Structures are given as structure tokens and as C-alpha cells.
């Protein structure tokens, strides 16, 4: 086994004494930093490489801190208006995962970069920490490399905001088979429109 395989096995045993101590120290350190900050190199290099990261020019890694728990509705003094059924403020569940939220925050903060992927690094009772791999689409090293040219196209702008990353796709209910009948045709909206549109074929 190579070195990355050993590192992968270490990260799988998160309850080991060494990793528990390491994560406790790291979460304390991460809490002192800003919510979105750049890191010089990936904390988990074997995981980052599996997700597409390479130690080349044009690749950057940012660490994002996301608060755990429910999503609170951003209203002034709890004034939601409307019917009592929609008066909820505190117990609302976010449709996106915390990882997808972290990717979105990094993508908004760094608008000129493209989000490639992300992975979990640590968590405590209050926060979850993710590292997001981003690519500079205007760097010559990226534009000249056949493996990374695809992300420089305009269609991939803010792909993290449209549920096109790995974490974003998981909340869209996509897949094949009878379990995913609600999203046949690409999305829930596309599926609903197809089932609720009457088509009258012209008689010839």
C-alpha cells in the first residue's frame, strides 16, 4: 500500500486516540480563524487528490466554517406574516447539506474562481469545517491542460449555486430506477411539467 492508502485508513478511524486528540486541537485552532480563509495546502491530501486537486498553479484550497443545526429564517423580530402554518422561524430544515452550504459560501466569496469539490475536515458541537477546492479558470496552466479545460467554459460559472457539484447533486434526488421516479427527466420541476402537460397529436 502507498502512503495515501495509510492516510485514508487513519482518517477512517476517527475514534482513535490520536485522531480524537488531533481533531480537538484543530477545531480549537479553526475557531480562532475567519469563517472563510485560504489554507496553504490541503489538510487531507489523499482525499483532495481523489476529488481532483493537484499541487499545480491555478488550484487553491479554502477552509469554510458552517454553523451546525437548523436553518433559522432571516426575519425581523419573528415577523413572518401570512398564515399561522408558515410562521416557523427556528425549526426549519435546510434542503441543502452543510457541505453544499460551505461550497456556496466559498463560491460567493471568491467569484472569479470555480468550485471543483469539497470534503469534511473537522467538526465540534457548534461548527462543521470543510475544505473547498477551487480553480482559477483564467490561469494559463489550467487553460492549457486538457484535464482541466472543461471548467474554464462559461457554463460552469457558479456551478456550486446550481447544485452541480458532488455535494449539491445529493440533495436534488437524482438517480435511476423506481426510487427516483420523482426526478425523471432531470429534475422535479421537469418531471411535474411532463406529467401535467396535455399533448394533443394532430390527426393526419
UniProtKB/Swiss-Prot annotation:
Keywords of the record: Ribonucleoprotein, Ribosomal protein
PROSITE patterns xref list: RIBOSOMAL_L15E
Name under which the protein is recorded: Large ribosomal subunit protein eL15
Gene Ontology cellular-component terms listed: cytosolic large ribosomal subunit
GO MF assignments: RNA binding; structural constituent of ribosome
Keyword Cell cycle: no
Compositionally biased residues, Basic residues: 191-204
Disordered as annotated region, ranges: 155-204
Cross-referenced Pfam families: Ribosomal_L15e (PF00827)
Coiled-coil region: none
PANTHER family recorded: LARGE RIBOSOMAL SUBUNIT PROTEIN EL15 (PTHR11847:SF4), RIBOSOMAL PROTEIN L15 (PTHR11847)
Family in the record: Belongs to the eukaryotic ribosomal protein eL15 family.
